[in-house]
Amino acid sequence: TWNAKEIWHSGKELHDSFPYMADDTGGGAIGWAADNRMVFASEQDGWQHLYSMSADGAGAAKLLTPGNCEVEQWSFASAAQTILYNSNCNDVDRRHLWSVSAGGDAPQQLSSGAGIEWSPAAVATTDSFVYLGSDALHAARPFVRRVADSRSTGQPFAGETWPEGFPTNRLVTPEQVVFKSADGFDIHGQLFLPKDLRPGEKRPGILFFHGGPMRQMLLGWHYMYYYSNSYAMNQYLASRGYVVLAANYRSGIGYGRAFREAPGRAGRGASEYQDVVAAGKYLQSRADINPARIGLWGGSYGGFLTALGLARNSDLFAAGVDLHGVHDWPTDNWDGKNISPELTKLAHDSSPVTAVDSWKSPVLFVHGDDDRNVYFAQTVDLVARLRARNVHIEQLIFPDEIHDFLLHRSWLKAYHAASDFFDRTLTVQPAP
């Protein structure tokens, strides 16, 4: 007893590394199933999947969830004989529920269609499980359904929670779009078209970039509160007449490890900026867009990309709203990391501050001054640089607020300020 025994080890390639999302799965990186089997997450085939094997080490690890798709959250059911999980298999820009035996029978898809489902959890002493679900027009609420019956549908056991007077009739269903970046990446996005858009009209367009960057915007209300808020804001902008595109740039999840870990990202070259430009050019190519009236917005990493777009391509982007963005990589929590001078220079060159001389478009900065994720000094420094160059800037600063705003009123004030800013800077003008 008390003797350790190796029953499996990962390979030596980069895709054999500990999977990025394993700590966020709900089931953890490893779990103990029935019949003395162990279940664990791995990206050894380039996608996050679940594997199982005998705890005594007999036999090879068995892939439970095959496909060019990713498992995100999982838990045990039926006395740990069954695994409930959600993934984007067969529907890359949503999440659906699946079940599979720990022994490795073929996976069974439990949900499909226009919904988004996540966080499945078995109900003790029953054959049912609960989960959270949403779709394009309905925010998250809890559902219950039976584990074994793939023909059944989840039944909500809580009502809608819209605030009184919420204009649900003004919500739109976003369309899935896919376009190419300059170096060949397929970039997925969700396109929100105003309900009152008429044939022949040219509307202003707005791009949204998520933070993280290991995130993915979906074709409906998001499972993370920050991005549920962002989805609501994109809906609000569409209701005000803008054509809105939420673009899932490289570095995000959902499209495999090679996409998430693409070379030259962030402070190593900002290669994902190619996806920002591609998104802008995609909007410009649309018949319903005024190509001279394209704005962009985002928070955190999305704020970084917003600032980079305005700094490098004010000819493409007419205005931007930057929420708590990184503006100079080496000055953002860089101390003590023992990074070489060469890489520090590369990080600086990959930052918005190095292109402020070509920044011409107006910008609104939103930041909490107690932000411990992206230091408030990032915004203070960039504002000073832009003022020295007579760039039109506006600021909304929240005293004592953190990165993910704590107060509901802070979110409302930020989003109303952003909408008002776009109304003033992207006023519809005759297209060239």
Segments and roles (model prediction):
Residues 1, 51-54, 101, 146:
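Structural recognition of the beta-propeller blade-terminating site
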Residues 35-36, 79-81, 127:
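Short coil/turn segments that connect the beta-strands within blades of beta-propeller domains
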Residues 1-19, 23, 27-30, 41, ...:
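Non-catalytic accessory segments flanking enzyme active sites
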Residues 208, 222-432:
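Active-site-proximal cap/loop segments of hydrolase catalytic domains
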Residues 44, 89, 195, 300, ...:
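Residue-level signal for short, function-critical loop segments
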